[in-house]
A protein has these predicted regions:
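Accessory RNA-recognition modules of RNA-modification enzymes
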Residues: 1-191
Length: 191
């Protein structure tokens, strides 16, 4: 087993996409046919290796794809962290983050600065606004190794039928009286 440390040269198969790269979408820069191929191979391999299903190909019917190549998820969970990833220096830094955890590192956050291509573009383009608001409250983001902090997760669900959003801010309870829920709700309604 091995862990990816750094990509020195991108694949010649990659195509430019206008989205921020995130750990949960390692194939997004590949054409959709290659994405499907690699996802199928990876899934079947996991069933063989971890599930101990040696004849998985005989049991597998077909890959069912989404009708949308981008913006197809109806739920996203963004994590807060007091330890962030510095993309320029490729190291961890003490910073208020809201976005995704770095691949393979449960305690380090990576800020989402723009649309990832997976969820609602309007929401994701405003995650940095939400992060700045939360940081300005003076309440701390979650610090995994220390197991302390106020802000834990920001979960968003989208109904594609009604085009409505449901927001869930997950916090610890200790500093809850210091958090202005009405002002935060107004921020979300104005987005």
């Amino acid at each position: 087993e091995c862990n990816l440390i750094d990509v020195i040269q991108s694949s010649e198969d990659e195509v430019p996409v206008p989205y921020q790269d995130i750990p949960g979408a390692p194939y997004i820069q590949l054409p959709i046919d290659l994405q499907h191929k690699y996802k199928k191979e990876s899934t079947l391999s996991l069933f063989k290796r971890i599930g101990k299903v040696p004849n998985i190909e005989d049991l597998f019917d077909e890959l069912v794809t989404s009708p949308n190549v981008f913006h197809y998820r109806n739920k996203m969970e963004y994590g807060f962290s007091a330890i962030g990833y510095d993309r320029i220096n490729k190291t961890d830094i003490d910073i208020f983050t809201l976005g995704f955890k770095r691949r393979g590192v449960w305690w380090m956050g990576d800020n989402l600065e723009k649309d990832s291509g997976l969820f609602d573009a309007l929401v994701e383009d405003n995650i940095s606004t939400i992060r700045k608001y939360c940081e300005a409250t003076g309440l701390a983001p979650w610090h995994g190794p220390k197991r302390e902090g106020f802000f834990r997760y920001f979960v968003v669900r989208k109904s594609y039928k009604t085009n409505q959003l449901l927001f869930n801010l997950v916090t610890t309870s200790l500093d809850l009286p210091q958090f202005d829920l009405n002002a935060f709700s107004k921020l979300l309604q104005d987005i």
